[in-house]
Amino acid sequence: MEPDNSPRKIQFTVPLLEPHLDPEAAEQIRRRRPTPATLVLTSDQSSPEIDEDRIPNSLLKSTLSMSPRQRKKMTRTTPTMKELQTMVEHHLGQQKQGEEPEGATESTGNQESCPPGIPDTGSASRPDTPGTAQKSAESNPKTQEQCGVEPRTEDSSAHMLPLDSQGASLV
């Protein structure tokens, strides 16, 4: 047996940085490079950069600063109702920013959500699928009462009147 060809001995080569950098700058660059653990976290996000203002879960914000060993020990928890509500509000705010003028929204259907006091479990469980809360609210009478959605009739020409924030008709 030759000790030099042992399968346990693995040597990695580190690519050299540009020669015009001083050693201190090269060391700082090396330290800023992501580790495999941080790459796993960033792959779950929608963009390569982690913007702490976009992350609704405060627990995730705190885990980003932890070491990988500390992160391993933590168990994954489901978000609280307050966190779900903020995620839904953030999602609905993004939808309203990209919404068409009022005349065009009638053809797409009513996309109102529940009032802030009533939890909207349909869209909170799937915040990336717009309109699913409306479909589930129409099929479930209890949800219809909570969200103020009237059941659809067979008459396709009937539609709901727009309501203000207190629930009174605007027309």
Swiss-Prot record:
<keyword id="KW-0597">Phosphoprotein</keyword>
<keyword id="KW-0007">Acetylation</keyword>
<feature type="region of interest" description="Disordered">
    <location>
        <begin position="1"/>
        <end position="171"/>
    </location>
</feature>
<feature type="modified residue" description="N-acetylmethionine">
    <location>
        <position position="1"/>
    </location>
</feature>
<protein>
    <recommendedName>
        <fullName>Protein phosphatase 1 regulatory subunit 1A</fullName>
    </recommendedName>
</protein>
<feature type="region of interest" description="Interaction with PPP1R15A">
    <location>
        <begin position="143"/>
        <end position="171"/>
    </location>
</feature>
<dbReference type="GO" id="GO:0007165">
    <property type="term" value="P:signal transduction"/>
</dbReference>
<dbReference type="InterPro" id="IPR008466">
    <property type="entry name" value="PPP1R1A/B/C"/>
</dbReference>
<feature type="modified residue" description="Phosphoserine">
    <location>
        <position position="46"/>
    </location>
</feature>
<comment type="similarity">
    <text>Belongs to the protein phosphatase inhibitor 1 family.</text>
</comment>
<feature type="modified residue" description="Phosphoserine">
    <location>
        <position position="43"/>
    </location>
</feature>
<dbReference type="GO" id="GO:0005977">
    <property type="term" value="P:glycogen metabolic process"/>
</dbReference>
<feature type="region of interest" description="Essential for activity">
    <location>
        <begin position="42"/>
        <end position="54"/>
    </location>
</feature>
<feature type="modified residue" description="Phosphoserine">
    <location>
        <position position="47"/>
    </location>
</feature>
<keyword id="KW-0321">Glycogen metabolism</keyword>
<comment type="subunit">
    <text>Interacts with PPP1R15A.</text>
</comment>
<dbReference type="Pfam" id="PF05395">
    <property type="entry name" value="DARPP-32"/>
</dbReference>
<feature type="region of interest" description="Essential for activity">
    <location>
        <begin position="9"/>
        <end position="12"/>
    </location>
</feature>
<comment type="function">
    <text>Inhibitor of protein-phosphatase 1. This protein may be important in hormonal control of glycogen metabolism. Does not inhibit type-2 phosphatases.</text>
</comment>
<dbReference type="GO" id="GO:0004864">
    <property type="term" value="F:protein phosphatase inhibitor activity"/>
</dbReference>
<feature type="modified residue" description="Phosphoserine">
    <location>
        <position position="67"/>
    </location>
</feature>
<keyword id="KW-0119">Carbohydrate metabolism</keyword>
<feature type="compositionally biased region" description="Basic and acidic residues">
    <location>
        <begin position="19"/>
        <end position="29"/>
    </location>
</feature>
<keyword id="KW-0650">Protein phosphatase inhibitor</keyword>
<feature type="modified residue" description="Phosphothreonine">
    <location>
        <position position="35"/>
    </location>
</feature>
<feature type="compositionally biased region" description="Polar residues">
    <location>
        <begin position="122"/>
        <end position="146"/>
    </location>
</feature>
